[in-house]
Amino acid sequence: FTPLVLGITQALRRNPIPYLIGLATAANIGSVATITGNPQNMIIGVASGIPYLRFAGYLTPVAVLGMAAAWAILVVVYRREFADRALPSDGNGPVEFHRPLLVKGLVATGVMVAGLAAGAPIPLAALLAAALLLITRRVEPQRVFGEVDWSLLVFFSGLFMVTGALEKTGATARLFAVARPLAEAGGASLAAVGVVLSNLVSNVPAVLLFRPLVPQFANPQAAWLTLAMSTTLAGNLTLLGSVANLIMAEMARERGVYVSFGEYLKAGVPITLATLAIGVAWLGVVG
């Protein structure tokens, strides 16, 4: 969606930064709602055995309320941008889209969600949807490979190497040993530890560190849900906090729009704090 946002804001002569930050933070907040929303949620879904619909029932309200909070914060932080309500005409005609591809994508998504709702294993449901898309594709492999952002893949390869090195040297284990007493307290303490670890070693390694510990908690389900919520929303704290943030920043940079680390913090920090407060409060009531 980054090219789409840039195209619209440039056509309307608006500052693209607030909309790009809104796009990235919304992607992170929205992904908290389901097991398939992001990689760490999938790990938690497999490890915890929480049914797909139950997981969504607990965390979808966090995503909805979090979206509302993020919108309000962006409007306040960039009030000058949103105070000007006069929008010029973009001069474009009707929007064109590839209807068969849209239908195929919706059907594949529906098959996956139906399988997950019926209790099918997460990997099997995802592979079934992917297989449906593969056997009906018409795009040549060369074109697909040409659209891959190889520089971003190299960046993530390096990031995972650094994370792996920290684990091999025992640095993450020592850090987790210090944080473990707080994590075992559950609730806000567990969420805080999840946020800190997610921004130090990334959210997926943080969840993997917690995986052997959570079954020992007094209420493992509540702990898993708190961990899913906190490690996901932690991605909004900094520009480097999530894959969505990095993809947005990289694609914007390629098109001449630079989202700086400091600029992102202006909205990222309050959005993270507000959504975490919502998540902790909600799970404290329903968990």
Language-model segment annotations:
Residues 1-5, 35-41, 122-124, 200-210, ...:
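Transmembrane helix boundary and interhelical junction motifs in multipass membrane proteins
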Residues 11-17, 21, 33, 53-97, ...:
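Juxtamembrane and boundary regions of transmembrane helices in multi-pass small-molecule transporters
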Residues 24-36, 115-119, 192-206, 229-240:
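Transmembrane alpha-helix interface/packing and boundary motifs in multi-pass membrane proteins
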Residues 41-54, 87, 169-181, 215-216, ...:
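Membrane-interface helix termini and inter-helical loops of multi-pass transporters
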Residues 67-140:
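Long, contiguous bundles of hydrophobic transmembrane helices that form the permeation core
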Residues 108-222:
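Transmembrane helical segments that form the transport core of multi-pass membrane transport proteins
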